[in-house]
C-alpha cells in the first residue's frame, strides 16, 4: 500500500507540474493549485488498463467562491443516460448529477455533507450503470483526503485574499 501511495504522489506531482502546483500529496490524495481553481484529487484503487479512462475523484475550490468544495468524479465508464450515479462514503449515499463519464455534487449543502462524511474516513465508491446496463463501482481509499481538501481550500482562500499569486 505504501508503494501505491508513493507511486500516486509521483503521478500527481508529474501531472500537476504541467497544469499546476502540488500543494500536498499523501495517502491516495493530492492538493493541486491550478491558479483559477484548487483541487483535492484522488485516483480510484482500480488502475485502468491501457486505453481505458482512469477513474478519479476530487473537490474543487475557486478563489471567487463560485465553487467551494464541489465534488466531481471521472467515471471509469460512461454512465447509462437516465441512470443514477451514487457516491457512497462509508454507509452514506449521495445522488450525483451525471453526464457521460463525469458526475458532480448537486450544490453547497450536499458538498458540505460529502466533505463531512469523507472526514469520517473509511472508504468511498462511485456506483453507476454503464451503457450496457452493467453496474460498476469505482472505489477510493480516503487516507489523505481530508488533508488534501483542507490544503486545497486553504490555498484558494490565500489566493482570494491576495496573499499568493
Where are these regions (language model features)?
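Sec-dependent signal peptide recognition
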Residues: 1-7
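N-terminal signal peptide c-region/cleavage motif recognized by signal peptidases
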Residues: 13-15
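A generic "folded-domain core" signal
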Residues: 17-165
